[in-house]
Amino acid sequence: MINFLMKGVVSMIVEAIEKYPLLVIFMLVLLLVMIFVIVYYRMSKKYEKSQIELKESLLAATTLNRCIHALTYHSEIDDAINDLLCLITEFFQGDRAYIFQIDYEQNTTSNLFEYTEEGATPEINNLQNVSLETIQYWLDRFKVDGTFYIKSLEEEVDKNSETYRLLKLQNITSLIAVPLIENEIITGFLGVDNPRRRYDNSSLLSSVVFFVSESMNRKQQEQKLKAMSYLDSMTHIFNRNALIE
């Protein structure tokens, strides 16, 4: 039966070629053109996608280099970190970027640095000595995933949780954050509120946190040395440097 049908189809094709050779040639050319267009379209889409990915990678690398430069060449660490947060906010097109430090002895975390875009409300004064219980969900996610990412506050976070309450008060609908780690202990975190672009790309933040930790450690050492310079090594009371200051 199949052989009979195949013979019938072949005979019809042969008959069509004999009767309408130009039409058959036209149809074949049209088919080849369609195949070429489809292949070209798919290749152009792949090329366009690869170009976008390359552009994004170059932008991330450039931003990382600028962040490292800011941390390395600024004489004032506070200014350096502020510039870094500005660059990160710009990269993600967020409302604000910030650094929190954890105090395990007091069981609290505090906002040490914050950069806010125009139109965004500063929150640093409202986020001092926050109970670690409030961000326990964050810490758990840091330990499991290495990042903390919320695409939609309303859809992803329990409305009865402390995390929801805290973020809702700050008009935060989405965020991305990565932990600061020292000796395998989470000492704080770096985050961006309401990122409008690249919100699912934590690679830049993950690359930056090492240099941020180093800069913050350097600042702590400088503060310790400065404090020591104010005390007499024998009596441990304030010396001339403290009086001058």
Set out the residue ranges of the language-model regions.
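Signal-transmission linkers at sensory-effector interfaces
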Residues: L31-I38, R42-Y73, L225, T235
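Conserved nucleotide-binding and Mg2+-coordinating catalytic segments in signaling enzymes
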Residues: H69, Q223-E245
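Helix-loop-beta substructure at the N-terminus of cytosolic sensory domains
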Residues: A70-L112
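GAF sensory/regulatory domain recognition
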Residues: I99-D140, G146
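Signal-transducing coupling segments at domain and membrane junctions
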Residues: K151-T173
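A short, aliphatic-rich beta-strand micro-motif
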Residues: T173-I181
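Short beta-strand-to-loop transition segments that serve as allosteric relay/switch motifs
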Residues: G188-R198
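Amphipathic alpha-helical "output/dimerization" segments
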Residues: R196-N217
